[in-house]
Amino acid sequence: MASQLRKREWALATAVFLIEWAFGIYLGYHGVLLGDAMSRTANAFYVLNSRPYDLTSMGLVWNPLPSFLQLPFVWAAKWWRPLVTKGISMSFVSALFAAWGVKALYSCFHEMKCRERDALLLTLLYALNPYTVFYGANGMTEIMMGAAGIQIIKNLTCWMRTGRPYHLINMGMAFVVMFLIRYEAVPFAIFIALGMALHMAVSKREKRYYPDSGLEPLWYVESTLWVTFLPVIFTAVCWVLYNWSITGNPLYFMNSGYSMSAYSAYYQSYGGLMGALSYVFSRVWPMLLPFAALLLARAATHTFRRYETAIMILAVLGLTGFTTVMILLGKSGGYVRYLCYPLFFAPAFIPYTVHAAGEKGKQAARISALGLLASALVLGWGFQYSSTFREDLLLNVPAHSESVADYLNANCRGGKVLMDSYRTYYTIMNADDPEEWVISCSRDFEDCVADPVKNGVDYLVVPQIGSYGNMDALNIAWPRLYNNGEEWAQEIASIGEFKIFRVKK
């Protein structure tokens, strides 16, 4: 029977992967290439297409795993460039994680001995949610973070039920994967650790493992948390040391000119605490419907007052609270996708809730299904008609990037072209000879920006000043160049937001 269930899990995961990847390819060929996702592909592209070839070209700001997994596609793109320029590689990675999340959820129902009918229905309601489908196909990291979160919560609830240390090891490995995808893994780990400590303090089974006297309970909690979180702590320390050894700044990923903190100058104010709360709720409420149904199911089955409810609140809403604080402090843009995690994390607690309900498990499953269905309907409507929920559809690669690449390919071949890849990443990916260009990861980039004439630069590509264009290295070094020019540079083309200059010799 167990073998048959595993086959079903793999079959469902394979189907999800193939559907998501096919949908991602469709999106790419129809121009839906989201900027953040394509930037991850670009980071991998630089490794094999910018001299000298090395992994540091991937950059130190964004977590490396999504880019690292695309390196085989980047290598193959030397013969067929659409593998990277049409989103085939990035959709492969997001589809892979979407399948992982679905498999983890489906297997969790089996671990909790839930009815197969309920397991399949609830897993499909999660997998077919429009938000899950879109982010499983578009190469963004939200589905990757969500899948790792489902794996973590699955093992958390299985550990709470059985106490087996095997699940702690699995949680630790999943946290490593999560950290290599997004930095939100750190606050999420804190919320999970608090939930684990609460469980060990209250659970009668856990109390059997330590004497209830002196500091023994604290030592037991500490040792359990070390077992769980040491892998991700080690990974985070390695990442800090990696930044330090290369840049001299251990927190380069947090405070450099390309980091998220550099964006904060462009984030709007939301009018204090109440304004921030209103802003967040207007975006997060459809994501909360599965969790609201989960709480209702626990109330209907008389399990709401158990301590596990507090653990669920910490795990599902912790990142939402963290993001709200960041928005209030002006450190987050508050996009809908930054608030989507309850949609991924709440379903992971459904198997435990159905199991804990005992004879009322059918009722808990039905209520949970209604919450998942309601969320799917609202988000499906939002993608069609709501400007709020359609905002993520509009954040594509910079317009005219391909036209700039076409111009450079046709008119500037053989010349030394200088550009900051911050806004020109998609132009670089469409270049015929990107190895000849000087971009942000090139060893001589800073010298060329400081003195293009002395360093033999032939052409410059400069984005329009204003908003994110102000973060471009050339605009920072030469603030008059875009609008007024410089005596050593002649404008030869203007394409969309970009201007191309020839350096006078």
Where are these regions (language model features)?
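Hydrophobic, aromatic-rich transmembrane alpha-helices
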Residues: 282-309, 350
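Membrane-lumen/periplasm interface segments of specific transmembrane helices
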Residues: 191, 198, 202-206, 219-294
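Transmembrane-helix motifs of polytopic, lipid-linked glycan transferases
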Residues: 89-113, 151-155
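Hydrophobic/aromatic-rich transmembrane helices and adjacent perimembrane loops
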Residues: 136, 142, 187, 331-362
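Short helix- or helix-capping micro-motifs
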Residues: 16-17, 119-127, 154, 175-179
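Short acidic/glycine- and proline-prone juxtamembrane loop motifs at membrane-interface regions
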Residues: 59-62, 131-144
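Membrane-embedded, lumen/periplasm-facing catalytic core of multi-pass transferases
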Residues: 367-425, 442, 446
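Signature aromatic-anchored transmembrane alpha helix within multi-pass, membrane-resident enzymes
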Residues: 14, 117, 229, 233, ...
